């Protein structure tokens, strides 16, 4: 049985992950649930707070993270919070020999480098991904092929999320951009939206458009526009369960790895071949 701690436990993703783990009691046990410092619900069982009944894991706060880790000894910590607190969580978990599944997005390059150094130094295993949905990763894999075969077409990326999402563009859109640029046989330049008299579109442009509204879980479309035809590759998530299922697979994948390496969902889903 894999013992799991979740930070961001009362968030949309955190609570969904806990519910799914608890539905698979033979394989997983939620031993810790962490949320923001001074949370008024501290001490109340996380199961009671998310509507599934007592599971024996009282809500704790981030300022007590190391104490709770030492008491519960999780195998894997799952983090869906925000960049700055996540980096601190990675440090504490790594120093206490706890493997990681990170779904937080919006990191700076410096924050990513810091986490990589911490994970390598402490010789733990980690999965870090902008999107854990299985379909999205097939979407990413298909983008590799399209960029290689029709990369001379004009390329645009459009993403839409719910009105509460704090970062833009989404981590998934940025990952799509990275995959495209890594597989193009030409120069490219990312731009973010267009406004005013911008002139004709240049061949190098890959423009990302971020839309926000309503309760959209996550829509991503990459457009390859050529002369006389247009190919659009789209993934739409209708439920967070799409992401949660991938997170659970990542927990199982990383649980016993102690090698100082960072893996991604291509590794988890065996898509790297």
Swiss-Prot record:
PROSITE patterns: DAPB (PS01298). (S)-2,3,4,5-tetrahydrodipicolinate binds at residues 162, 171-172. InterPro entries: DapB_C, DapB_N, DapB_N_CS, DHDPR_bac, NAD(P)-bd_dom_sf. Its EC number is 1.17.1.8. The keyword Oxidoreductase applies. The active site is at 161 (proton donor/acceptor), 165 (proton donor). Pfam families: DapB_C (PF05173), DapB_N (PF01113). GO terms for cellular component: cytoplasm. Pathway: Amino-acid biosynthesis; L-lysine biosynthesis via DAP pathway; (S)-tetrahydrodipicolinate from L-aspartate: step 4/4. The keyword NADP applies. Keywords: Amino-acid biosynthesis, Cytoplasm, Diaminopimelate biosynthesis, Lysine biosynthesis, NAD, NADP, Oxidoreductase. NAD(+) binds at residues 8-13, 35, 103-105, 129-132. It is an enzyme of class 1 (oxidoreductase). Signal peptide: none annotated. It catalyses: (S)-2,3,4,5-tetrahydrodipicolinate + NAD(+) + H2O = (2S,4S)-4-hydroxy-2,3,4,5-tetrahydrodipicolinate + NADH + H(+); (S)-2,3,4,5-tetrahydrodipicolinate + NADP(+) + H2O = (2S,4S)-4-hydroxy-2,3,4,5-tetrahydrodipicolinate + NADPH + H(+). GO terms for molecular function: 4-hydroxy-tetrahydrodipicolinate reductase; NAD binding; NADP binding; oxidoreductase activity, acting on CH or CH2 groups, NAD or NADP as acceptor. GO terms for biological process: diaminopimelate biosynthetic process; lysine biosynthetic process via diaminopimelate. SUPFAM superfamilies: Glyceraldehyde-3-phosphate dehydrogenase-like, C-terminal domain (SSF55347), NAD(P)-binding Rossmann-fold domains (SSF51735). This is 4-hydroxy-tetrahydrodipicolinate reductase. The lineage of its organism: Archaea, Methanobacteriati, Methanobacteriota, Methanomada group, Methanococci.
